[in-house]
From Swiss-Prot:
Keyword Cytoplasm: yes
GO cellular component: cytosol
GO MF annotations in UniProt: ferric iron binding
Location within or outside the cell: Cytoplasm
This protein's encoding gene: fdhE
The protein's name: Protein FdhE homolog
Keywords: Cytoplasm
Length: 301
């Protein structure tokens, strides 16, 4: 059972062709689609075992998204930027409860080496978990033990993605500016998605935590915003479903997923399945400006 703060809804346009600055996700649908996509991609992947671990994890996320107790959303002002970035200790108890449920459900499904890591994580103090969760949400991934990050982020993702749709309904989208980080929770995107609704060819960035999407103009760097020196890369041809857009100014890059051509794609799963593209760009001196919830890579210094 969940409760929302009593904040007036912001009227929106009824036009089906109106560009939506923010799009809310259905967490259950996202997790179910992601699990199915991971199963499909694992068949031809050298990372099949890891894909299967992620599939089981995401399947539990879907179950928790449907059944868990999320408490009550903290009150916030509708003019506040990134409202879900402000959640504090009250939220910690809920996502940490989700973490314990997630680990308990996953524990019988993994081998002993992973089970040892999970049992150790289950023994951590609430204060330590709060600190690690805060570091991850702020993008300081290297401050958290690498073997714990996947599970902590998964639990936080279930909590933040539950509240994001209700928060978006209460945000004044007219005030949402083009930005590199999620306007709802302040976290990094996973990748860009190119969609066919409400109009073909629009680009949205997909949040790595709350699963929301926000509009970002194409051919602009999603990190520094410049639009002069951008390059598109792909492994096979110019019509590839996964491409990379790199910036010669800041040397950052983000992947673009053309879901308008392949609706079964999932940003996290397909990003994981195309790590060879990342290797190519890293070798050329570019660095990802995104974060994959299924692969919490430590930031470079």
């Amino acid at each position: 059972m969940s409760h929302t703060a009593e904040i007036p809804l912001v009227p929106g346009s009824e036009s089906p062709l109106e560009l939506k600055p923010l799009k809310a996700a259905d967490p259950q649908a996202v997790y179910h689609r992601r699990a199915h996509r991971l199963l499909s991609l694992a068949k031809d992947s050298p990372l099949a075992d890891y894909f299967e671990l992620c599939r089981r994890l995401v399947s539990i996320q879907a179950k928790l998204a449907e059944e868990a107790d999320f408490g009550q959303l903290l009150a916030w002002g509708k003019d506040e930027a990134t409202p879900l970035s402000l959640l504090g200790s009250e939220a910690d108890s809920y996502w940490q409860g989700l973490l314990q449920q997630l680990l308990s459900d996953l524990l019988p499904q993994v081998d002993e080496s992973i089970a040892r890591v999970m049992r150790l994580l289950m023994q951590q103090s609430p204060e330590q978990l709060s600190s690690w969760g805060r570091s991850l949400r702020q993008g300081h991934v290297s401050e958290v033990p690498a073997h714990f990050s996947l599970f902590i982020w998964a639990a936080m993702g279930v909590y933040w993605s539950h509240w994001a749709p209700m928060v978006i309904k209460r945000m004044d989208q007219r005030k949402v500016a083009q930005q590199s980080m999620c306007p709802v929770c302040g976290c990094h995107p996973v990748a860009s998605v190119i969609v066919d609704q409400p109009r073909a060819g629009l680009r949205y960035l997909h949040c790595s935590l709350c699963e929301s999407e926000w509009h970002y103009i194409r051919a602009h760097c999603t990190s520094c915003g410049q639009d002069k020196e951008m390059t598109i890369w792909s492994l096979d041809d110019a019509q590839a479903q996964v491409r990379i857009e790199s910036c010669d100014e800041c040397h950052g890059y983000t992947k673009m997923m053309f879901v308008e051509n392949s609706p079964s794609m999932d940003v996290a799963a397909d990003d994981l399945a195309t790590l060879m593209l990342d290797s190519e760009l890293n070798a050329k001196g570019f660095g990802a400006t995104t974060l994959n919830p299924l692969l919490m890579a430590h930031e470079t210094t």
